[in-house]
Amino acid sequence: MLDLLNKLNDEQIKPVMDTEGAVLVIAGAGSGKTRVLTSRIAHLVEDLNVDPYNILAITFTNKAADEMKERLEKIIGDISQMWVCTIHSMCVKILRKYAERLDYKKDFSIYSETDKDKVLKRIIIGLGLESDKYLKTSKNLISSLKNKDMSTEQFARENPRMRDVTSYMKIIDEYNAELFRSNAMDFDDLLIKTYHLLAEQRDVLLALSKRFRYIHVDEFQDTNFVQYNIVKLLSYANGNLFVVGDDDQSIYGWRGADINNILDFEHDFKGAKTYKLERNYRSTKKILEFANTIIANNTLRKDKVLWTDNDEGVKPELFVANEESGEAQYTALQIKTFVQQRGYKYSDFAVLMRINALSRSYEQEFMKYGIPCKVYGGFKFFERKEIKDITAYLRILCNPLDNEAVLRVINVPKRGIGDKSIEQLVYYSEKNGLSVFDGVFDCDNLDLNAGAKAKIRGFKDIISKLIVAKETMPLLELVKEVIAKTNFMSCFEEDTPENDDKKKNVNEFLSSVEEFARLNPESPLSEYLNSITLSSDTDEINEGEFVTLATIHSVKGLEYRCVFLCGLDAEIFPMQRALEEDTEEEERRLMYVAITRARERLFFTRARSRFLYGGRRATEPSKFLTELSDKLGIVKKSEQRYEQGGYSSDRSSYGNYGGTGSHSGAGGYGSSDFGYKNSGYGGNYGSSDSDYGYSKSYGGYKNNSYATGYAVQTSKPTEKIHSSDLGKFHTGTNVRHKKFGDGVIISTKNNGGEIIADVAFKGVGIKSLVLRLAPLEVID
């Protein structure tokens, strides 16, 4: 045990040795709280001869529980009698033993979220209601009421003006009755029924609280009302409760977590002792300076200041793009530079965002530059249901023979076209050798009643008009027309956070269309669909070696060498909804969590304009950026537009599509706004592919000399394509490249006399090539 203590600092040793009574450890980010927890348990067993049977350690993820078990087994050996588990697992153990006290059988089922959905849908339909309208709110209410230990009667009394409150209460009561009849519990039942068991069955309370002489709780700031009271009851007999948490990392209020559980701990447990772990082992001094500055603006917190003996480090930087595509491209190019020139691995990087809708532009840019990435905190953008639904409509307009697309959206939004009607439609189409869409046009011949036929005919009329519109409407206007004519947004009428996210995803999809149409003004809908299909089908290049794209919530507890925190615009972070609901402090805690994920480098990014609410609009900086810049100042890196030689879009201001090269400082990243004063971005990185016609050098500078546009060596290109042969290369042409292999041209454009082709290569991604220089050949 002495060896273990030697690995702890003075701040950590004190709570480890304080074993009696209630103890609160305020553990700042990266302060070694897991080591403190395991060391304390080891001290109890090894030095104080406490039986592992009498120790309980509660975590809030299975991964954390497994890691703690592994550490403890290495230190003290057999821990089979010790309970080290999540709070839900603990409740299952208790309920299995005492199930009959609650009129359940001990082999009760535990319903998953999918099981819960099926039960609720059946009940809602049985009550003559629409499942799509009531399902999500019913689920949320069930969880909320159970975690607050509130009856439906009490909720109805307190919310008399809530729309359809009576219907919701009927659904919830019937749901709970159905679970009981089925001898089943859902996840929230595991908590609330354990709480009632302990609170109402004194002999059970005494038996369990006497057994667990020493109780440990990790991530205490994330406990809700029921969880907190379970822990409090279990400590009844001995009072030895050791909790570890950080009020500054309480970010799950929307899920029921109550920050007051940790803030009021000393009040609730008289005589409780509090220790602070403020030494950070993760981040540089500069990063911690930003973390301390941002969180100091909160009022609901215990005072603490993180410090470290780590290096001073590089001051975090802010990059301001003209629009979201530039924000993503800047990040991609920075990552490429760090990997190719500074010895970083892709797994060293995380791109963090407040909402997962922002991942779309990053997924596209990363694919383009061959950067492997994995999306957490949501599905990949083009794989999300609402996006797949919209693209299915667009696929039908381009290819009415696409049966899968027709079947996907024939009843989206709900049109009353039921399963039986669809089965009859498919049967008729197959029997007569027709596509499903042809079957839709023959709906009068289907073996259905007049009402069912009329609904299918309505779908046919919508699609027919959109097919006509496709021939004359510009791309962006056409997509907006599809959304309007299909009444697509009615899918998200219910006011829920989930629907808010889906609306934002639809808006982000429109941004993708707008960007494509602007950069490819002559390209039809089919080419746009090709571009996003390639994006959707691209998986990680090297498993385990990828950039993390994630919401901030999903990376809590993790760390990375380099973090890009994107979308720092007003209304996005902090979210407008949070400001309206007076939860700004939780948003600021989320900002703090994001900052403290970074070990060495931290970048903030935002865009001066975004495609929001159906159109492009100017944005304002996040108030969090203002709070940081007012006190610390932020090194600002701002892209600039071309003044000559090419497009004036975000993409061309990176020199992505070539150009003539300029030394005026008007392009590339511009002046000292790039941030690498000792290395030319058009140097080593660009020249490495100079023989392949790849416009990979994106302007930049070296020693205050600036370059825009195409900066690779061009004096002796290998295997040039003769100008007379350029006509062979057009959208849809299959080609072979000397380095990148086989691919297909997905778009071409004329930039200052140079023909630039975007080519999607198998296993590589999309590359922008100067056709005059690229060693390409047409293949069959």
Regions of interest found by a model, annotated:
Residues 2, 20-23, 28-31, 42-214, ...:
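A basic/glycine-biased coupling hinge at the interface between accessory DNA-binding modules
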Residues 4-20, 226:
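N-terminal pre-P-loop "Q-motif" helix
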Residues 21, 50-54, 80-81, 116, ...:
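Short glycine-/polar-rich loops that comprise or flank the Walker A/P-loop
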Residues 25, 29-37, 270-273, 278-372, ...:
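Helicase P-loop NTPase motor core
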Residues 29, 212-223, 227, 247-248, ...:
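Conserved Walker B
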Residues 31, 221-297, 304-309, 427-430, ...:
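Conserved helicase motor core of SF1/SF2 NTP-dependent helicases
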Residues 161, 359-371, 384, 391-634, ...:
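Conserved helicase C-terminal RecA-like lobe
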Residues 567-768, 773-780:
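C-terminal accessory regions
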